[in-house]
């Protein structure tokens, strides 16, 4: 499936059914971004979101939502495809702050958090992960919440949603680099 849809599914998709959950305000945008047939969709009662059924997602379903992690095939894809994967992740479970344009990806699945960090590193983006007890409506859920923070600039395509893109900031030349750069790639000799 497309990297964008795969990323969105990792964040807001049903692990065992070919479905994703989309915020009501994003329905039209997400429909245009996913690039796959939506066989049906319906509004969730009182949740402010819709469920999209996308048959092509059957190819990536797992036994439990706890089994979600970015596949090596996607982590080793082209740079353009990895950016699209990040966009799907950020459009589903990420946010870009208004103050410093800091991006945050949030999940309760540790191996997904670790694979998101690997994706960011592969794009040259420094990041940091913290964990804290997860709560819902102020009540502990018994799970751990993993937050991955990184800084983004207006020349980095971390989201496709206009409400998130508008929060990115212009890159300042005289600041410490927020990236790692590759100097050389050499084959291993066995």
Kindly label every feature range from the protein language model.
Residues 141-145:
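C-terminal polymerase-core module
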Residues 1-137, 147, 174-190:
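Intein-associated homing endonuclease modules of the LAGLIDADG/DOD-type, together
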Residues 148-152:
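Phosphate/diphosphate-binding loops
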Residues 153-170:
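Long beta-strand-rich cores associated with HINT superfamily self-processing modules
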């Amino acid at each position: 499936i497309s990297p964008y849809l795969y990323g969105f599914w990792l964040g807001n998709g049903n692990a065992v059914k070919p479905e994703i959950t989309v915020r009501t305000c994003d329905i039209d945008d997400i429909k245009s971004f996913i690039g796959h047939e939506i066989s049906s969709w319906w509004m969730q009662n009182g949740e402010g979101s819709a469920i999209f059924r996308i048959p092509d997602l059957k190819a990536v379903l797992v036994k439990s939502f706890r089994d979600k992690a970015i596949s090596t095939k996607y982590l080793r894809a082209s740079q353009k495809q990895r950016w699209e994967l990040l966009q799907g992740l950020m459009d589903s479970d990420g946010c870009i702050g208004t103050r410093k344009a800091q991006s945050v990806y949030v999940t309760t699945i540790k191996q997904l958090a670790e694979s998101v960090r690997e994706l960011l590193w592969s794009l040259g983006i420094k990041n940091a992960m913290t964990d804290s007890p997860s709560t819902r409506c102020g009540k502990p859920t018994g799970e751990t919440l993993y937050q991955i923070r990184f800084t983004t600039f207006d020349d980095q395509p971390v989201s496709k949603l206009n409400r998130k893109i508008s929060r990115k900031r212009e890159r300042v030349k005289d600041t410490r680099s927020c990236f790692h750069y590759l100097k050389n790639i050499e084959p291993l000799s066995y």
